[in-house]
Amino acid sequence: MAKYRDYLPQIDGDFFLTRGGLETTSVLQGNVDVSHCAAIELMKTDKGRARLRAYYAPYIDIARDAGAGFILEAPTWRANTDWGQRLGYTAASLSAANRAAIEMLHGMRIAQENRLPIVVSGSIVPLRDGCKEADEMHPCEAAQYH
């Protein structure tokens, strides 16, 4: 499942694209309401997962047409313990949601990998908001939290 775990092809200087603004696009253009701008919420339903696949597809096409690779970033930005609790997840259900998101992207990669290299990536926001300087964590605090 983890094709590039030990070697990331973008490190060699090849051109890779990634998505942009999943949460903003989902809310403003897709008319989708997700709690706390947490795109992981879209993983809860078939319709939400279909929206995610439809969101990623044009980006993959652009990368292919440009002769680039693609970094397929999971909808897991706000899928950490702090945000998960606000969203009503238990530790087990949050772990399952994160894993399901990555598994979905692996399926997308497998379907497209003959067309271009695709790296599946999952990011989780730091504790608190992560967008405010006051919310920054010391590296030791982050290591303990995550």
Residue positions per predicted region:
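Domain-level signal for soluble alpha/beta catalytic cores
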Residues: 1-146
